[in-house]
């Protein structure tokens, strides 16, 4: 299809950099029949300064050799690859969350945006609708689902990389966002700090992260130590075996006068309807609940944060215009990189 993004676009190569040493990358190899019109389906990138090489597989450069701690998300988003897409679920939930978190305008033509942790591309889609050029990465194989969901966009560049070793040129982005990701990183603060060097002066960054609550932890934190011992495939099978009948049981209990509703509320699968805001069928809602449970129980890391700590990160990063609030997903925070670098005052000689 003319104008579609089906291969790695070599015009974006000057934005990439070696994650090991920061030097430029060059195309070292192209598979026979694997490139056309300045785009590559299969091949290899090589650093111009150090021995590092990186494969291009199925049109996407890969800067990690495995999913590491994010393997559960790779499994999750390749199986639920449409369930949170606004256009598929007939709602604007992702759009609402994106704009509530970022506060950005709906038109970003001429700007370059970085998405850190893309999953299957629910927010990639919204960012692309602004007209911006979007670079989107994930540690996990969820990039395969994102690629499938957004291949009709001409200005998207999807790649697999670690948030701790981002393979891009510094100060190359007008805007950076990271949503639904930070709490699942081993070192949450360092994951946030790793994004700052890639933001241009005057550029904006917006993130969200789970909020830490004092007192008795939510139910999922009691279940996670047991659930995490299972492979994602096994946990998914258990949830698919248990949640649909629990849904039907809860639905039946609500019809029983007096005590039925109180008993039904003890079944920990959330509400049976989100109407009028979200008009799911029962079958769709069962799938949503299976996905939600898998998302809560399977990640290797889940580290909620305190508002004061998030504010301290933004201040330590030297950002200005800091705004922090509670919203979608917990803590929403944004800030701007100063146009002028900070002044360094040297000590007078005596």
Where do the protein language model's features map onto the residues?
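Conserved class I S-adenosyl-L-methionine
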Residues: 204-237, 241-244, 248
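Conserved N-terminal segment of class I S-adenosyl-L-methionine
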Residues: 2-169, 175, 301-303, 309, ...
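A short SAM/SAH-binding and catalytic strip from SAM-dependent methyltransferases
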Residues: 174-187
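Conserved, well-ordered alpha-helix/loop/beta-strand core segments that scaffold catalytic motifs
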Residues: 313-314, 319
